[in-house]
Each structure stands twice: as C-alpha cells, then as structure tokens.
C-alpha cells in the first residue's frame, strides 16, 4: 500500500515534465501475438516514440490520448507505452489516474463501449481496475473498425451456413431425397395441406351433385312435401294430393271441435293412400269402406317410416264361417293393394295365430312319413348329410332346450313332388289341411286369387316348400363336431411367449342363422320378374309348450316404392337365388344410413303360428331367433298378370261357345228330322182316301209324332219334288177344308215350339222361311 500511495503522490511532479500518456488498452491476444508476449516477458520493451503522422492513437471507451490535445479522435498523439513486469501495478494505476482531463463521449458511443465490454473474453475487471499484467499496451482499435469487423464476421458465418446448406442439398439430391422442380412456364408451387383439404371437399361436393342429378328430385323427409318431392308422381296428381290433404286437415279439425262421435259414411270411391306421410289408423280413409275395419290394425313405424297390417285370430274367432270368408277376401286385397306406380302400400300383412289348427310339422311328417329323405346340414361345416326325417327329428329332440336345438338345419323339401335333384314328395292330405284356412285357400299357388289354372297341384313350380332352422346361437367349441378351430403348434419359442390362449383360441362360435336381403322372383332370364310370397311359421317345441307364442323371426322389409334404390344401395344381384342375392347383412347402422337417404323400412317380429303375406317388390331379410319350421311359396296374383287372366277368360268363352255349338248341332239334326217329317206328312196328303181321325191323332200329340219320325230311318227327299207333290195334291183335294185348317194349326204350333226352345236364331230363320213359304203357297193354292 505504501508503494501505491508514493506512486500517486509522485504523479503530479512527473506531469510537468512528461507529455500526457494514453490509457492502457487490453487487447485480445491472437495466436500471432502469443509468442511476442512471451518474449516481452523475458526482455522488457523500451518506450518507442513515433511521429504523429505514422500511427493514429486507438480510442478505448470513447476517450483519446492526452488532455491537452484539442484535435479530433483520430489526431491525438500516438505513443505506445510498455512497462516492465514489476511495475505493472503502478503503471496501471498511473494510466487510470487522469480521468479529469478527458472529454465526455456521446451517448451512443457509451452504449457501444458497454456492448464491447460484454463481448470481451481475455481481460477481467475487478473494482473498476483493468488487469494489464504481462500484456503490452498496444494502440486500441477505433469503434468503427470494430463494428465493421463484427459485420464481416457475421457475413462470414452466414456464408458458411449457406455453404453448409448447399452441401446438404447436394448430398440429398445425390441420394434422391429431394425432388427437383422443373423450371419453366408450367412450374407450379407445391400445394399445402389446406389446399389439399379444399380440393377433397370440392370433389365430394361434385360427387354428391352427380348423385343428385341421377335422382330427378332429392327425397325430402318433411311431412308436408315428402310425397311431392319423390319424383314419382306427376304435377297434376300432386295438385290433387295437395287439395285432398287440405280437405283432410279441415275435416279432422272439425272432428276435434265436436264432442259427439258420429259415424263415418262409407265412401263409394277409395281415395289414394300415401304411406310417405306418417298416419294413424283412424286417418286412413280407405278403411272406412271396409266391412271389417275394426278387426284390421295398421302399424306405422316411426323409425323406418313403413307400414304393415295386423290381424289377430282371437278377434276373428267371433266371426261366422261366411263372415270369415268375407274378411279373408278384404284382408288379402288390402295387403296386396298398390298405388298407380305398382308399389304396394304395406310391406307385410300378418294374421297372428291363424295356423293354430295345423299340427306340428315335424311331428306330423316324422310320424306319417318316417322314411321320407331329407338333406341335413352339419354345424360348423358346409357339408350336407342325407338322412330320413325321423332320424332328423330324433336329433332335434335330443339337442332341444328352451327354444333352440344344437343340430344342423334341414334343407328345403317340396310338398308337391320332387323334380330332378329336388327332395320331397307329393303330400295331398297335408295340402288339403292347408286349404281349409280361408286365407291360404285364396293365396296358394293354385288358389282363387292366383292367375294360374293348374290341372293338378303337382304341376306347381312355386311351392309350397318346407324347411327347419335351429335358431341363431353361440355354440361352445367343445360341442362342435370336429372343431375347425384347432391351434397350430409351432417350434418358435418367441411366438410361444406371445401366445395367449384366451385371445387367440375361441372358446365358442357364433352360429349365424340368417337369410340376407332378397326379393322373391319367378321365371328365368328376361322373363324373370318379382312376385308375392306367403309363409306359415310353426315353432319347434319338442314337448315344451308355452301359453304365449314364441318369437321365431326378426324381419326387415323395405318399402316397395324404394325397390330400385334398395337394389342399388345393397348391390343386389336379382338373377341369383334368394340366399346369394345380397353379400352384406343389413344391421342398425346400415338401416340408419339408408333412412337418411329416404329409404323406408319396417322392423317386424314374427311369432309362432303366424301367417304372413309379402307383396311384390318388397326386399326383405330374415333372422331366425328360435327353432322354427317354415312353409313358404310364391303366388302369381291376377292383378300382377292381367294378360294371363284375359287369356283364361277367352278360353272359358271358347269352351262355352263350343258347348253352344254342340247343342246347335244337335238341334240342327233334330230340325232336319222334323222338316223331313213335315214333308212326309205333306206327301201323305197325296192319297185322297186318307182319314182325318189319323190327322187328329197327330194333332193331339205333336211331340210324340216328331219323336216317332225321328226314330224312323226315312229316305232323303229333295224339297223340289215334294213341293210339286203338294201342288198336285192340293189342287186335287180342295173340298176338305176342315182338314186343311187342322194341318195349318198343327204346323204353327210345332214351329213355335222349336223356335222357342231348341233351334238357334240363324237356323230358325232359315227353317221358318221355308215353312212359311209352304204355308203361303198352300193358302194361295186353296
């Protein structure tokens, strides 16, 4: 410390003799200066004086050299100082001891100096003192050059980065990772993710627009415009429907205002009923004209939008046999009724409990026809086994439990005789039992509503057929015969470690008892067309009987007016058999999708002892819920085939005309015999000795005389000579007037009798003319 204060005290004395000294500058050592610094430590440098013009003093912290200098920052005295190693501390203090004579720098320069201090790495600051040990005091660089150096360094760094990027791009190009864009007029920028999404949305809109153009008008689901927007009705008819709807609304508003219930008058004309609008039973005007409308229940399903008809045997039991016949006629005609587009109003008609009078089908056939061959499926396999119906019934009894049995299904057998590879036989007694029902009597393939006129029931190509299904169920693998789900043993230990028996090996299998969507058809090739179907359901009981009927089938039926759209959406192949027309199973998700597109459907549950009727163009799918034996057949209704009905009527007319012709031939033969008998009578008058009592005997029994004449074989006599004979006889025999009057009266009576009873108009006219001519000639001759 004493040395420090002595140096400070000696400083003013030296000021007068020596010129002002610049402050020491701490320089960042470059690798070239490191050697010089090491040599300077060994050999201390001496003070070197140079001219003012040679070197320019470097400013540090915005300050110049001595305090007496009045020039700019670049014109101060350029003097470099060096100190020995021992006097470093004193020199540093001396260099910092002249703050009073320095000029105040500007504010931006102070900011620059602060930034420079922060960037320095070589030197350190302790309590405001700069360490300069072992470092020579070289001239400091100006701030402008420092800024320029910094800019150059930044530029160099940027260039290095660019070079690195270029090298990386070249490497990627060589590896093929970067695709080169061809420069030219057709150069397009790469699309962004947003542009791609916009393009996808535009494509979807175009597709929807095209689908909308395929349909003439998009289907609307509003209650008020649903019928109009379907595109199936003309504008004139739409206006009529609007007017009818307005009248209906006014009518029902009036009914709501009245408290008394009045009877609705029966309408002569049945109005058009549109099922596209949700309606209730009492709103359907077509039911008002029916005699048994209180026994018909119409169900409109809000989810699917389609309607169906129900009738219950418990309510029909009160009817007499004659009334039952009339009710069956009304019910069948209502189920198969269609609009002007040939689309049925209802998707199905069901008579619940109408087959209770029939015996259990399996029991009946296994007891009465035990050796009848049938084809039986095997669970879990596609193989088919041929066995007898009694053996099949025994397997059903052995595996039956609570509505299902665990055996294969029985394939269809024909009940009207087997043809080619078919299985079945002709069972006339069973068919007679079916015909006892008034509903089935009308709707069998040869029924009263059918357009077919079969000579024998064996000629039917439309059924009936019978089959048995076990019901959809989950079956354990242990109960499956020769289970196909066996684990494949592998020698790989890694796979064995990943083996999870619960996940990889199924312990039970789903047995799907389903018939995919299809439509009933008749004919082949270009003559193939849709038709109606009728079915009878009898549940398999096997001694277990319940009071309430069991659900046997879950059915989905699509509206007949949406037939073409359903075929397009479900990709139906209508030329395939019913089991393979559709590839996919229509579940709830698919139904909701179809409903959003305007397609109507109905979900139906069929019970034991039900008889159901399905109109044409109704696509339907079945799922067997419990074990059931089914009967089904196709019916060609007269309303579906008006041409065949017309041909049948013409055939009937031809038969009646042929019958009339045979009768006319018989009458003509009788007439010829009668005419010959009259001529013989005239010829007999040639004899003048003939007695009148004989003529009176013929007059009293005219029919007997004609029969006697008909039985006698007389020679053929031409009319010309007989007329000559009559002339001669009547010219000779003119005196007997009473005999002449009696003959005229007998001829008139006989001619009137034949004209009224036996002879056709054409024939009678010819014979009447000849006889009248004879009579007139006789009168004139007299």
Curated annotation (Swiss-Prot):
Source organism per UniProt: Xenopus tropicalis (Western clawed frog)
One function term, GO molecular function aspect: metal ion binding
Binding, Fe cation: 518, 520, 620
EC number(s) per entry: 1.14.11.-
Sequence ranges of Basic and acidic residues compositional bias: 14-26, 101-113, 149-160, 167-177, 185-198, 657-669
Region of interest (Disordered), residue spans: 1-223, 645-669
SS bond list: none
Transmembrane segments: none
Location(s) in or outside the cell: Nucleus
Entry function: Lysine-specific demethylase that specifically demethylates methylated lysine residues of proteins.
Cofactor: Fe(2+)
UniProt biased composition (Low complexity): 30-42
UniProt cofactor note: Binds 1 Fe(2+) ion per subunit.
Protein name, as recorded: Lysine-specific demethylase RSBN1L
Keyword Oxidoreductase among record annotations: yes
Key words, A-Z: Dioxygenase, Iron, Metal-binding, Nucleus, Oxidoreductase
Compositionally biased residues, Basic residues: 199-222
Comp. bias regions, Gly residues: 62-74
Family, per entry: Belongs to the round spermatid basic protein 1 family.
Binding positions for 2-oxoglutarate per the UniProt entry: 515, 612
Gene Ontology cellular component annotations, sorted alphabetically: nucleus
């Amino acid at each position: 410390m004493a040395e420090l204060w002595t140096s400070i005290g000696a400083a003013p004395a030296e000021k007068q003799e020596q010129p002002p000294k610049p402050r020491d500058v701490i320089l960042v050592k470059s690798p070239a200066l490191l050697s010089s610094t090491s040599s300077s430590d060994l050999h201390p440098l001496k003070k070197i004086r140079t001219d003012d013009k040679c070197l320019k003093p470097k400013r540090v912290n915005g300050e110049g050299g001595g305090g007496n200098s009045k020039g700019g920052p670049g014109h101060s005295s350029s003097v470099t100082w060096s100190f020995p190693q021992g006097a470093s501390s004193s020199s540093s203090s001396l260099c910092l001891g002249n703050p009073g004579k320095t000029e105040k720098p500007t504010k931006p320069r102070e900011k620059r100096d602060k930034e420079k201090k922060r960037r320095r790495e070589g030197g350190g600051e302790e309590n405001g003192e700069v360490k300069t040990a072992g470092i020579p005091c070289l001239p400091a660089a100006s701030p402008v050059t420092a800024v320029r150096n910094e800019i150059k360094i930044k530029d160099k760094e940027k260039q290095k980065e660019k070079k690195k990027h270029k090298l990386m791009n070249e490497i990627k190009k060589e590896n093929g990772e970067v695709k080169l864009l061809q420069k030219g007029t057709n150069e397009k920028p790469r699309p962004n993710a947003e542009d791609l999404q916009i393009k996808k949305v535009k494509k979807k809109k175009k597709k929807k627009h095209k689908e909308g153009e395929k349909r003439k008008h998009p289907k609307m689901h509003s209650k008020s415009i649903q019928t109009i927007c379907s595109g199936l009705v003309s504008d004139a008819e739409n206006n009529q429907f609007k007017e009818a709807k307005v009248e209906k609304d006014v009518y029902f508003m009036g009914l709501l205002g009245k408290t008394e219930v009045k009877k609705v008058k029966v309408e002569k004309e049945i109005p058009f009923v549109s099922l596209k609008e949700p309606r209730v039973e009492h709103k359907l005007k077509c039911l008002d004209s029916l005699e048994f409308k209180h026994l018909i229940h119409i169900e409109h399903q809000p989810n699917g939008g389609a309607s169906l008809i129900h009738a219950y045997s418990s309510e029909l039991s009160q009817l007499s046999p004659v009334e039952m016949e009339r009710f069956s006629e009304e019910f069948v005609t209502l189920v198969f009724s269609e609009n002007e587009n040939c689309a049925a109003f209802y998707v199905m008609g069901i008579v619940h409990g109408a087959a209770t009078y029939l015996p259990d089908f399996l029991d009946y056939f296994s007891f009465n026809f035990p050796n009848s061959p049938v084809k039986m499926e095997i669970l879990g396999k596609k193989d088919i086994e041929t066995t007898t119906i009694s053996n099949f019934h025994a397997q059903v009894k052995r595996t039956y439990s609570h509505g299902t049995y665990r055996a294969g299904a029985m394939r269809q057998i024909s009940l009207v005789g087997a043809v080619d590879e078919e299985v079945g036989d002709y069972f006339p007694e069973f068919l007679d039992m079916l015909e006892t029902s008034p509903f089935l009597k009308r709707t069998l393939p040869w029924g009263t509503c059918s357009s077919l006129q079969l000579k024998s029931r064996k000629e039917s190509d439309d059924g009936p057929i019978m089959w048995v299904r076990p019901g959809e169920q989950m079956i354990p693998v242990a109960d499956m015969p020769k289970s196909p789900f066996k684990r494949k043993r592998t020698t790989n230990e890694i796979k064995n470690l990943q083996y999870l028996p619960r996940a990889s090996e199924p312990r039970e299998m789903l047995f799907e008892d389903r018939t995919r969507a299809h439509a009933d058809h008749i004919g082949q090739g270009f003559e193939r067309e849709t038709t109606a179907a009728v079915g009878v359901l009898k549940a398999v009981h096997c001694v277990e009987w319940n009071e309430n009927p069991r659900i046997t089938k879950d059915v989905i039926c699509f509206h007949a007016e949406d037939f073409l759209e359903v075929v397009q959406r479900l990709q139906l192949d209508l030329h395939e058999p019913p089991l393979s027309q559709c590839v996919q199973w229509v579940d709830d998700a698919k139904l909701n999708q179809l409903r959003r597109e305007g397609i109507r459907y109905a979900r139906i549950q069929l019970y034991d002892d039900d008889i159901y009727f399905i109109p044409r163009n109704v696509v339907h799918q079945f799922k067997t819920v419990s074990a059931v034996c089914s009967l089904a057949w196709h019916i060609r209704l007269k309303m579906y085939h008006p041409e065949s009905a017309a041909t049948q009527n013409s055939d009937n007319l031809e038969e009646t005309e042929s019958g009339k012709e045979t009768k006319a031939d018989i009458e003509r033969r009788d007439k010829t015999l009668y005419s010959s008998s009259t001529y013989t009578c005239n010829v007999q008058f040639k004899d003048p000795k003939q007695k009148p009592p004989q003529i009176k005997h013929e007059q009293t029994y005219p029919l007997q005389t004609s029969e006697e004449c008909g039985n006698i074989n007389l020679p053929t006599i031409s009319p010309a000579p007989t007329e000559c004979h009559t002339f001669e006889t009547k010219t000779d025999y003119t005196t007997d007037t009473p005999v002449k009057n009696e003959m005229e009266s007998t001829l008139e009576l006989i001619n009137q009798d034949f004209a009224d009873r036996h002879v056709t108009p054409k024939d009678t006219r010819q014979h009447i003319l000849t006889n009248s001519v004879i009579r007139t000639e006789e009168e004139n001759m007299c």
